[in-house]
Amino acid sequence: MRESTGIEEQAGLTELSEEAGMAEMRELHVYDCALMGAFPMRLILATMLVAGRLLATLMAAPSAQAEPETCPPICDQIPATAWISTHAVPLNSQYRWPAMAGAAVAVTRATPRFGFEQVCATPAFPHDSRDWAVAGRVTVVHPDGQWQLQAQVLHWRGDTARGGQIAASVFGTAVAALRACQLGAPLQSPSVTDDEPTRMAAVISGPVIMHTYLVAHVSSSTISELTLWSSGPPQVPWPTVADSAVLDALTAPLCEAYIGSPP
């Protein structure tokens, strides 16, 4: 079983994530999706003065048209452009899923756990690396027998080399935990249907039927999740949809949202 491997990876992530978190606490939040360089004090004061005047101007005059959110400058929350398109989400023709950016809420004071972890009763780890991530979540709840939805985007700020390693390790740990689903939920049976180094699709059968997709976009230190499930036999049949199409739809927005991160 790979449960021990997942735990070892998680333990390794703890030190890495703590270092990343402490480094970010020491940064002024002039974040450009990279480590901030050192600036002379005069330049900092001049920049603050100009920024203050610019802010006052922007507050006084309404914007004609808002620019799409990207990182930078929007790096302390999930950019609106990072979410999967509603039209690419399975069952959209039946459920008319909401626009993800408009329905997303920030995940704070809680670990942004993946949807399968609740179904599989995956144990929580102390000092989870995801605690250091900027995260947003969309949840659509329906009655039993109807498909429900969870979408999440997690982003680690700072140096993308280090953040990318964290994203890749969290992804690997998640895949191992999903494969070990029956350790916590014997009645649930996982099956990985697309197994790639940084992309995964799986079906979990049992009392809860679940389809889950997970992408680690290492070059932007970001993970995107899409999970749909039905508690009890679903009244709407699952459509024929290629795993790769959904995974591609999760990946593409990250390249646009996090400027400077190659596909």
What is each of the regions a protein language model found here?
Residues 18-19, 31-66:
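Secretory targeting and sorting signals
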Residues 96-106, 110-111, 168-211:
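Short Gly/Thr-rich strand-loop-strand
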